[in-house]
Amino acid sequence: MLLVMDMGNSHIHIGVFDGDIIVSQIRYATSSVDSTSDQMGVFLRQALRENSVDLGKIDGYGISSVVPHLNYSLGSAVIKYFNIKPFFISMDTTDLDMSAVEAHQVGADRIASCISAIADHPNKDLLIIDLGTATTFDLVTKDKKYLSGSIMPGVKLSLNALCQGASQLSSVTIVKPEVAIGYDTKTNIRSGLYYGHLGALRRSVEEFGSPVYTIATGGFAGLFKEEDIFNEISPDLILRGIRIAFLENNKKGV
């Protein structure tokens, strides 16, 4: 079995693949993971056992990380506690044409999502929108040319900034508001968060020009599922992209 990990700024998303099927998924807050390799190794083994994953069957480990200061400890933990050399996805491990951008600045999660989207929809121009800590937009042409896109604060990050910057405002649960015009502070905030982000999503898609097939992923993609912005929502896009990159590089002996 192949274990893949998407290490984001807010959450760690772990997937266990048996062939091309995800048989287990685990989510933890990134802040819950200690930074030493031993602590991380113990944490990972315990998390997998708690989710009934047979550690003896894991024979590969693929990682997408946008938390560089944890990469060394994570890699060391996998080697020591799983006896596996981990594969880290990067600009050097993909056949995406990234010549149009500063490739070294592109996050591993964005690369993984593009790889997965291309595999699912070959010969299409694609727009991948990842609604996580940040909301990112990535354009990829049908001939696998990565054009990048844009980045804006995510829904939760916007809420946190609002509450930290305005002393009389407190946090709210993030849900689609029942009405656009709020009747108290909480419903005002919910309305602003939802419709403000929705407006930014619509305008960004519009500004990217010619018709593209639009795929959403990330923790807040489902918040906008009733809107007509996306052609599809793919929660496992990054995990599947890590798997594809792992297998392709394994064939090359990387």
Curated annotation (Swiss-Prot):
Keywords: ATP-binding, Coenzyme A biosynthesis, Cytoplasm, Kinase, Metal-binding, Nucleotide-binding, Potassium, Transferase. It is found in: Cytoplasm. It comes from the Bacteria. K(+) binds at residue 130. GO terms for biological process: coenzyme A biosynthetic process. Its cofactor is NH4(+); K(+). GO terms for molecular function: ATP binding; metal ion binding; pantothenate kinase activity. The active site is at 109 (proton acceptor). The keyword Kinase applies. It catalyses: (R)-pantothenate + ATP = (R)-4'-phosphopantothenate + ADP + H(+). Substrate binds at residues 107-110, 185. A monovalent cation. Ammonium or potassium. One of its GO terms (cellular component) is cytoplasm. InterPro entries: ATPase_NBD, Type_III_PanK. Pathway: Cofactor biosynthesis; coenzyme A biosynthesis; CoA from (R)-pantothenate: step 1/5. Disulfide bonds: none annotated. It is an enzyme of class 2 (transferase). Homodimer. Catalyzes the phosphorylation of pantothenate (Pan), the first step in CoA biosynthesis. Belongs to the type III pantothenate kinase family. This is Type III pantothenate kinase 2. The gene is coaX2.
